[in-house]
């Protein structure tokens, strides 16, 4: 990756962290198709236990996903980052960590949140935005 493409990404993340990402569209539903150029997938506290968001960008863009901080109960819940539509290769299945960054190989990425039915949802925020094809 070129340094010139890293700098805007770092600036966006630092701004998003300071401003708590309040300026981005927030999705707190359990799944859906997201077509905004950027936004936040935020904790869904409802009764559903398997939430799938498919992020679609125009063909000339990749999807970039960033998770600043994640502390899920690893035995009971996880986030899965998929490179494309559901059923495509999994880029990561995660439950904890910080400063995680994923980039799709094409213009679609899927984020899946799964938890056990008796376990309450933990806090999570997933920032997504379009990234020009290089």
From Swiss-Prot:
Compartments where found: Secreted
Pfam families per UniProt: CUB
The record lists its disulfide bonds as: 30-51, 74-95
Sorted alphabetically, the keyword list is: Disulfide bond, Growth factor, Secreted, Signal
What cellular-component terms does GO give this entry? Answer: extracellular region
UniProt record, GO biological process:
single fertilization
- As given in the record, the signal peptide range reads 1-20
- List each copy of the CUB domain by range: 30-131
Q: Oxidoreductase as a keyword?
A: no
**Entry function:** Stimulates cell division and progesterone secretion of bovine granulosa cells in vitro in a potent and dose dependent manner. This protein appears to be a potent growth factor with effects on ovarian granulosa cells.
PANTHER family per record: C-TYPE LECTIN DOMAIN-CONTAINING PROTEIN, CUBILIN-LIKE PROTEIN
Q: Can you name this protein?
A: Spermadhesin-1
Q: What is the lineage of its organism?
A: Eukaryota, Metazoa, Chordata, Craniata, Vertebrata
Q: From the UniProt record, report the name of the gene that encodes this protein.
A: SPADH1
């Amino acid at each position: 990756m070129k340094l010139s493409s890293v700098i805007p990404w770092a600036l966006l993340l630092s701004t998003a962290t300071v401003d708590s990402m309040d300026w981005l569209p927030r999705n707190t539903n359990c799944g859906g198709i997201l077509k905004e150029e950027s936004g936040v997938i935020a904790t869904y506290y409802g009764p559903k236990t398997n939430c799938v968001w498919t992020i679609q960008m125009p063909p000339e863009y990749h999807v970039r996903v960033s998770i600043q901080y994640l502390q899920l109960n690893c035995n009971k819940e996880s986030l899965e980052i998929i490179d494309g539509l559901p059923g495509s290769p999994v880029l990561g299945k995660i439950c904890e960590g910080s400063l995680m960054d994923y980039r799709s190989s094409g213009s679609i990425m899927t984020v899946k949140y799964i938890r056990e039915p008796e376990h309450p949802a933990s806090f999570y925020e997933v920032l997504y935005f379009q990234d020009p094809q290089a």
